[in-house]
Amino acid sequence: MTSKIQGKKPTLSRRDFIKSAAAASAAASVGLSIPSVMSAEAQNAQKLWKWDKSVCRFCGTGCGIMVATQKDNTGQAKIVAIKGDPEAPVNRGLNCIKGYFCAKIMYGADRLTTPLLRVNSNGEFDKKGKFAPVSWKRAFDEMEKQFKKAYNELGPTGIAVFGSGQYTIQEGYAAVKLVKGGFRSNNIDPNARHCMASAVVGFMETFGIDEPAGCYDDIELTDTIVTWGANMAEMHPVLWSRVTDRKLSSSNVKVINLSTYTNRTSDLADIEIIFKPHTDLAIWNFLAREIINRNAVDEAFVKENCVFSTGFVNIGYGMRNNPQHPKFKPEERDIVAKEVSKIVSNDEGITLQYLGIKAGEEMKMDKAGAAGNHWGISFEDFKKGLEPYTLDFVANLAKGNPDESIESFKQKLQSLADYYIDKNRKIVSFWTMGMNQHQRGTWVNEQSYMVHMLLGKQAKPGSGAFSLTGQPSACGTAREVGTFSHRLPADMVVANPKHREITEKIWHLPSGTLNSKIGAPYLKIMRDLEDGNIKWAWVQVNNPWQNTANANHWIAAAREQDNFIVVSECYPGISAKVADLILPTAMIYEKWGAYGNAERRTQHWKQQVVAPGEAMPDIWQMAEFAKRFKLSEVWDKGYEALDIKPVLESAKAMGYTEEDTLFDVLFANKNAKNFSAQDALLKNEFNTEVLGDSRNVEDGNGEAFKGYGFFIQKYLWEEYRQFGLGHAHDLADFDTYHRVRGLRWPVVNGKETQWRFNAKYDFYAQKLGNGKAFAFYGNKGKDMPAGSLNAPSEEKVSIDNKAKIFLRPYMDPCEMPDKEYPMWLCTGRVLEHWHSGTMTMRVPELYRAVPEALCYMHPDDANAQNLEQNQVVWVESRRGKVKAKLDLRGRNRPPKGLIYVPWFDENVFINKVCLDATCPISKQTDFKKCAVKVYKA
């Protein structure tokens, strides 16, 4: 199939031209013949088209696409067609419905094309004023003024950037350089905090290194596919097509879907297990107990490659630790109070008995600050912690469908264990937001590895625990580049002095420039805005005021506090509407870039067309803003509370002057200018940042922008890849990626890696494993504290080349249904729309398919309240309420007691309802469970 993008001029010949070509391409893709006349017309049409490889804009699958452009008489190009790339190994020519409309997202009627500033009648900035068009110079003038006001008052902690898992890799790298290296602030955090942070911490705590061991090839090699909180049929549809193909190709292949509600993934499943929200923790522990009791542990694998570990349990829920905070409504405070202490429930009295904790006791959450601390324990202690998770206990705790018999549910749990334990079966566990957006997201991620490591079914072709990424570059940018508030590139962290030293050397910064104090994670940035501790924020490539739970608080903070909010956007979404300054931004095919997908595959693309109006790429925006800061303004002051000293004199000793700008140092230094604008890759190509373009957009100084004159994207890439070379994060050079359909890192001697940690396939496992079959080299040369089930000791245990198997108990979520709010709420996505809908709701075909978010509900729950199909209802929690239309027979079929509401529709602003509890370790918000009531509107 090919999606055609028609031009604005309604000439019949052009229309017929494109229709013929698109029809021919679509027919060919499904093996149909077409009339010879139409075929000839199509061939003539496509002679004027230029096809180039690119990457889909949407999920973390990383599908390759082909983009067709056609130039008009003035040399301006427009995208005229999109199709799947048959040479792309991920999708093999197939796209999902969103992928076919990748180009149409760029041509919405309300595309932002000029900077917009809130002003009063005199044209002066006024936070309560209305938006008015301004020049880029005027926009940067106000942006600079407000930044320096906040920075001079509060220092590096007073400013923040909301980054993205949809940044290109070079954009994310530029943002980290500017914020952490230039402004000396660690207050940059991506929306990937909402989607992948729990997976990241699960990887880091288990393996000492981030990202999956396996790859998509596991789908074709496995016998058993288990999805945990992953509606792959809608959220990763192209991968699901591969799962479907594998399932239908062999009667031996089994699919099991674990979910809190029935969805399209259930349709293919041999077994569907509907569990109560949060009880996946107990099901994983049941599996581990079964493995041990059935003598199914791969003892040789575990002895050679694993150590056992545990941590504190009284760690809170990532909420504010002050329930009397003046911004809370009275009805919010009882739930927030559990951040300080809670009463142990009857179920917790059973699951925590190994710690001597009893039901009815008060548990003080005094280890919240040490939530990530963990230590080694014995195998005997590990077994003791699993004793409560019998079939009877877990079945009664976890059964999520009231209409299902307990015996049926028990049988499903037994079958699940049978499939995992069968020594003759390969097995892959896939999960996404159901496990990541979880108040114990780190724990439940670690539990997946617990089961696979006990069985010796990890890092092997066809077997492994596999976290599926949600966003197109949550892996490649947010994680690998390190746009989180605690990270640096290649899994390094700001708190490690050696890591800061390495970074300062690559960036040519004075020693001591980087800030050692971890910055504010995504949700804390919002809370700090509410408290007045952050007074300037820049939003890039995401929509935080729609995508953050408990949204009423943050909208009030943006509009009522003394702060300045900048939003770089392509369309007027909710975040743009609450901003003080909107910067019009180039979209994916209007710039050069790269993404990294869920199987560690890095893919690059070229700019295909020029952005409309005055919209400019994010790299350009950061580079122009960097010109506004002399080194004397950002490096000549120390901050005792942050242990930051002045580094201006050290900078002078390196050859810099106090008049040099951050642009000169970070983006236009001598190394950067060695990357020529005459590069062969640029021949006959658009590159707005390097060469300028026909629009002659005004730059930050009020002059026509003619390009930087050096290949800034290539410079950023080649500098960035220095971090990973030789450190098991090796990436290929820039030119190589433009020749291939992506490579899975580490890329060593031109060879990609399919299965990490396995010496048959991984260069580093061979190099560092001392002849072993497996080497979990993220923990090479490391040790950790030993201890008991309750606490660490002074002793150490080696974890050299080993992975950790964690004991993590079941605990209740902080908010559960009760008499006043009797139903669970789960949020998520639908196939047709992407995240907040800012792009996909502008595509007519996608909008017509799903024009609004619905409230999916069980018919019996509706009947109990005399509610009917398509009736408008209120969905209300302790935090807020929204109206939505009921769907009692749609694609999502919740059990009694649970509703599902997608979050793509700003008119059904469901994040006003959601609870802002997080995993205390990963700081990732739990969007999958809170208590609500539903009633007639």
Swiss-Prot record:
Binding-site residues, Mo-bis(molybdopterin guanine dinucleotide): 98, 166, 191, 195, 228-235, 433, 437, 543, 568-569, 591, 618, 827-836, 911, 928
Keyword Zinc-finger part of the UniProt annotation: no
EC class (word): oxidoreductase
Cofactor: [4Fe-4S] cluster; Mo-bis(molybdopterin guanine dinucleotide)
Family: Belongs to the prokaryotic molybdopterin-containing oxidoreductase family. NasA/NapA/NarB subfamily.
Stored CDD domains: MopB_CT_Nitrate-R-NapA-like (cd02791)
Gene Ontology cellular component annotations, sorted alphabetically: membrane; nitrate reductase complex; periplasmic space
PANTHER family per the UniProt record, alphabetical: PERIPLASMIC NITRATE REDUCTASE, RESPIRATORY NITRATE REDUCTASE
Cellular localisation: Periplasm
Protein purpose: Catalytic subunit of the periplasmic nitrate reductase complex NapAB. Receives electrons from NapB and catalyzes the reduction of nitrate to nitrite.
Keywords, in A-Z order: 4Fe-4S, Electron transport, Iron, Iron-sulfur, Metal-binding, Molybdenum, Nitrate assimilation, Oxidoreductase, Periplasm, Signal, Transport
Signal peptide feature range: 1-42
Domain 4Fe-4S Mo/W bis-MGD-type, chain residue ranges per copy: 49-110
Biological-process GO terms, alphabetical: Mo-molybdopterin cofactor biosynthetic process; nitrate assimilation
One Gene Ontology MF term: iron ion binding
Record: residues binding substrate: W903
Entry PTM: Predicted to be exported by the Tat system. The position of the signal peptide cleavage has not been experimentally proven.
Protein name listed in UniProt: Periplasmic nitrate reductase
A Pfam family reported for this protein in Swiss-Prot or TrEMBL: Molybdopterin
E.C. code: 1.9.6.1
Positions bound to [4Fe-4S] cluster: C56, C59, C63, C96
Assembly notes: Component of the periplasmic nitrate reductase NapAB complex composed of NapA and NapB.
Cofactor binding mode and count: Binds 1 [4Fe-4S] cluster. Binds 1 molybdenum-bis(molybdopterin guanine dinucleotide) (Mo-bis-MGD) cofactor per subunit.
Recorded catalytic activity of this chain's protein: 2 Fe(II)-[cytochrome] + nitrate + 2 H(+) = 2 Fe(III)-[cytochrome] + nitrite + H2O
Chief location of this protein within or outside the cell: periplasm
